[in-house]
Amino acid sequence: NIGAVKLTILFTIITVCNANAQQNNLSYAVAWKQTAAEHRALYYQGFNIARLHVEQALAAEEGKPLAIIADIDDTLLLANDYWGYLISNEEDFFNDTSWDLWVAENSFVPSPGSQEFLQFCANNNVEVFYITNRDQGDPTFELAQQNLNSAGFPMVDREHLTVLRETSNKEEVQRGIMEDY
């Protein structure tokens, strides 16, 4: 009987350890992003430094008008719920199909400090340009525009939003904007 009890306990320990070893690694990253003060602080720090640079450029009043060029996903808009969705569906890596469906649901939240920073820019006549390399087919532009508008960002129109569906390289568009700003 003692041998059977030891064997049962050993089997239980092995089963629990094996279950823990198979836990989705995304859960650690998502938990950190959703709860860590450092995560929020890093966003605020980045946008505060950017604001300082804009203030300095405004004070210098040199040459061309000023502009900000921003990426959208994980820069201005956070998709924490999407990563939670992957975990709950036992997926452990980004999935284009589920991402495309999720983008249309418009469940993004603005990153900490992003709205305030871009509103500061708009209030000070600094043009705000958005560039993304999303591809959700034909409605990609409208979806990106809807996501940004829902989050309350300024200057979200055809002149200020560029969607690159064929490439992830944003340099050519950035150079084009920098010719005028």
PLM features: residue spans?
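Loop/turn elements at helix/coil->beta-strand transitions in domains of secreted/extracellular proteins
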Residues: 63-66, 122-129, 155-159, 181
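C-terminal cap/substrate-recognition subdomain and adjoining C-terminal extension
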Residues: 22-23, 37, 135-181
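Non-catalytic pre-domain segments flanking phosphatase-related domains
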Residues: 19-70
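Active-site neighborhood of HAD-like aspartate-dependent phosphohydrolases
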Residues: 40, 58-67, 76-109
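Second-shell loop/turn segments in exported
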Residues: 32-43, 100-108, 130-136, 161-165
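Bacterial N-terminal signal peptides
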Residues: 6-16
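Short, acidic loop-to-helix structural element flanking the phosphoryl-transfer center
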Residues: 96, 100-129, 136-137, 142
